[in-house]
Amino acid sequence: MADTVAVILAAGQGKRMHSRRPKVLHRIAGRCLVEHVLAAVGEAGIKKQIVVIGHGAEEVREALGPEYTYVLQEQQLGTGHALARAREAAGTAATVLVLCGDTPLLRPATLARLLKEHRDRQAAVTILTAVLDDPTGYGRIIRDGQGMVAGIVEERDANPVEKAIREINTGIYCFEAAYLWPFLEQLQPNNDQGEYYLTDVVGLACRENLPVQAVAAGDPEEILGVNDRAQLAKAGAILRRRINMGLMQAGVTIIDPETTYIDATVRIGPDTIIYPGTFLEGNTIIEEGCSLGPGTTLRDCQVGKGSHVIHTVALESEIGPGCQVGPFAYLRPGTVLDARVKVGDFVEIKASRIGAGSKVPHLTYLGDTTVGTGVNIGAGTITCNYDGEKKWPTVIEDGAFIGSNSNLVAPVRVGAGALVGAGSTITEDVPAGSMALARGRQVNLSGRSKKSSEKRQEKG
């Protein structure tokens, strides 16, 4: 759609959010509100997208990145004024699609249908409408005897007959640029707010008997705008149900969709089972046949085919195929588990790579560590990687065995096939095939226990 430009109005403050953050940057399902709108526009085939920014302009620009065109509305003087600011950036585009940055539930198919109807009917203006059971608060669509749009009546100006109309204006429009830009120059701020309203452009088109059409959204939930925290939560719940339903239809089992939170950016393969209380966030990718949860959070992670992750928090980590992780494991950024790795209960791993088939079953901290293949890490093993100023690496080569309750003081290397005796504190490299013991020798004092017991009894 090279001849079409989308303009997203995102300059408002959103006072009802009671937030220092611009309204359009509040997040649901892994994206801020305006990102959901931009994603829908892009998936509808519109490549050129202009974002009108105002309140928190630099914050919005930084959040969205350089791929969009930005225009600044320094004073927020209404939707008509905001769109007029985008005229130069729109260039020679023949059709202008206008959307609000706080409508995150719009579907790409709805926008594509709106554009198609606009072109097929050769309209000057096409309005996306919705039919609501309770239209209170919205402008009503007035149609003539031929079904053409004759105007928009705001709630405060509507008579009883007009208030009974259930078709409402969503604030999303297609305009032919040849009519739009001249009409914007004619707008006057003849209202209590002293603002320039985009709805007045529709009125100008109707007065000149230009073809003004309306296309109803199939699902009224799509047009929900977010103006406060309650509406933010409502939109998040709707989007969560939509995401979960799409995944289930694609072959993912979600035991309890109401307690499963999956961002719009997450990808999950078929035959994966997701248990209650699971959060999948960011750019997480789950391959087929996995089992996740309950009580699991994965953010920006990759999980290989057939892995099982239970009661675990993993951040910016890679879990290879056939792994078992948890319960109560913590994988911090930079963790990589190769195939068939076992990470058990109360294990924390940070910035480390664990080789194929290795086991870290319980009560262990591995930081800045490289573990080879077929290694067993005993319970209570700690890599002492931080000296108060710098973090140092630990290397445990293939086939090594680390006994329980061992401390590996970095920088240190345990060679292939080496064995570290339980309770050791290792401060020097262990050669391949060697056994290292670094603990005090046990001393048994005969009869000492009886004497100690008698003294305790005397003290009573």
Curated annotation (Swiss-Prot):
GO terms for biological process: cell morphogenesis; cell wall organization; lipid A biosynthetic process; peptidoglycan biosynthetic process; regulation of cell shape; UDP-N-acetylglucosamine biosynthetic process. Acetyl-CoA binds at residues 379, 385-386, 404, 422, 439. One of its GO terms (cellular component) is cytoplasm. Residues 1-229 are annotated as: Pyrophosphorylase. Its EC number is 2.7.7.23, 2.3.1.157. Its cofactor is Mg(2+). Binds 1 Mg(2+) ion per subunit. Mg(2+) binds at residues 102, 227. The active site is at 362 (proton acceptor). It comes from the Bacteria. This is Bifunctional protein GlmU. It comes from Moorella thermoacetica (strain ATCC 39073 / JCM 9320). The gene is glmU.
